[in-house]
């Protein structure tokens, strides 16, 4: 299924970037909401995120992904502009999977929470090894936001979306432990 999604994502992206009017009309008529079902149990509008990802504005999409996760977590998270690790478990699985699929489809399977989680599992759940593998840290030095991150497809697998590590690993650990992934394992 993932290989099919990657191929579909690549095809859609190539058509999306083609300036030909007939192709754009075809996309509008047949795929007005893109190729990823924008499922949300809380009626979150993922179309702006989908557009940024289709345009491969990965930095803008990263910021918007956090905003959407804050919306899912509630008013307090929206106001403080970040999420407590304890709020992650209550994020709806359908929404987390939608966010992940949007990233997967727009990056040829290179980016997304599920990609990061697979890498984390492959390194024995060792966050230190994960940070190096996805280029969030080099030796003892954290990658500086935003200038040192790679905001295009030349980034290593799992590089995006970002998760703020200033408060430790608890947020990303909670994302990786979320029940949404048990449906995909």
Protein language model annotation of sequence segments:
Residues 2-185:
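Surface-exposed peri-terminal alpha-helical interaction modules
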């Amino acid at each position: 299924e993932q290989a099919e999604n990657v191929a579909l994502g690549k095809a859609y992206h190539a058509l999306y970037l083609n300036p030909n009017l007939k192709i754009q009309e075809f996309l509008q008529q047949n795929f007005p909401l893109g190729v990823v079902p924008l499922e949300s149990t809380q009626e979150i509008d993922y179309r702006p995120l989908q557009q940024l990802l289709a345009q491969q504005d990965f930095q803008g999409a990263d910021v918007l992904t956090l905003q959407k996760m804050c919306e899912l977590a509630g008013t307090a998270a929206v106001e403080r502009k970040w999420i407590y690790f304890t709020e992650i478990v209550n994020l709806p699985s359908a929404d987390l999977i939608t966010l992940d699929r949007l990233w997967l489809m727009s990056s040829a399977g290179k980016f997304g929470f599920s990609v990061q989680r697979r890498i984390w599992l492959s390194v024995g759940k060792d966050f230190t090894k994960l940070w190096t593998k996805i280029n969030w840290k080099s030796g003892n030095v954290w990658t500086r936001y935003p200038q040192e991150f790679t905001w295009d497809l030349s980034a290593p697998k799992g590089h995006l979306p970002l998760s703020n590590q200033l408060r430790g690993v608890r947020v990303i650990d909670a994302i990786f432990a979320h029940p949404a992934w048990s449906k995909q394992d």
